């Protein structure tokens, strides 16, 4: 899928931002906008790639399905890397701020659980499966993309791959695979990692 299909205006805008990025290196406002704008282009590329995955599945083209779904998953990891270069787009910052509200270890754990639930299942199984609240917050954040969304998409693609092969896999219980993340206590750093300008250049190469 070429850059032209992602949207000419979006590509021109993002290419211009990246082309002058080195001149504004260290400018906090520019670098924030750069990451946010390039993130949008990457998300749009992912949306189009998802359409390619769907088309391949409906056509029963196993090879094309594997190729398209693999590229889609790679885009998730690339976006996770991009967003990790800014603290504002890290799930670690969200969790850190939530835990800071607690005075005792028990309160900190409770606030972290609430923070994790709010951006994923929004509550228990009833809320997620029957209340229409799963992904209500819809956050594109470093850490969340790699450890939550990537896992879920890969499981779904594996399910569809088996269907293409003529197998009858069990239906996916998404809540059962999502809930463990909401109850986990694995640490996420709130500190930015990597050079946002260099990663933005990588993203534009992937989009174009």
Region spans (language model):
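C-terminal amphipathic alpha-helical interaction region
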Residues: 35, 49, 62-208
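Single conserved hydrophobic/aromatic residue that forms the stacking wall/gate
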Residues: 1-7, 11
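Conserved, mostly hydrophobic/aromatic
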Residues: 17, 53
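Short amphipathic alpha-helical heptad-repeat segments
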Residues: 38-49
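Repeat-mediated protein-protein interaction surfaces in helical alpha-solenoids
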Residues: 26-36
